[in-house]
């Protein structure tokens, strides 16, 4: 793709995200979502591969339907209340339609089927954008309307997302699909707490974005898309493979790594809200995700590829690791000691 075109699409992506998260009017928020959608489509289909074109088409159809539902929800609310303010969403039908629309945009169960297919048809850098930046505007809308949404509906969607995100990722061999189901599972944790402590949802999203960026950039650096090729990477970049191992365990939520912090705080908040059963369900369902994270980590660092010589190292010099990957992997694994400070800030 032309560098100038890529720059224009990236700026449009940032502009659409900024418009949505900073607006109070429904039409402006909708316009920001549309700018985002139109900016990401060329980035998804830039390889001109049939899978990429198919992914872009699926993404466009899903996001167009979700955007239409957002507009319909805001118009229904304005019809009954005379308000276009995002925080004044009070009509029950509008709340229900908006929840459905945002679930479609995020890829929450039962509207999740498009996300793994789109991520599989995209490059790793575009997949990173789809998993992080593209989820920020819908989560911002959830944050702004959290006090009027239906807790029972959101809790049901969240537990189903955590269950299916873990369960459907078990038999995957494509790394992008595994990361897509990982994203669906993490969205379940973010969604269940949005009504009770919205700031905790944002903290969870920020930490998830950091860890996911570290994983995607590492995989992009070692040019790995399948589990079978992941098994041979540690001979080329042993230090990077070791950090990938720790980052994957952090994504799984194992202490004493960064990913344990949001899960710990969410379980604590759910217990305070007399939702101990939901907390137990999420904790048990996270074991499904732990299995495929361990599978990835095992392939990245422990298994040995078939070899016929005693020399495992390649003869050529490896490229230096990007400083951004080093910083992201460090943050993704070492934030837990300052968790008391972080928990008092939210």
Task: Map each language-model feature to its residues.
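Core, highly hydrophobic multi-pass alpha-helical transmembrane subunits of bioenergetic inner membranes
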Residues: 1-346
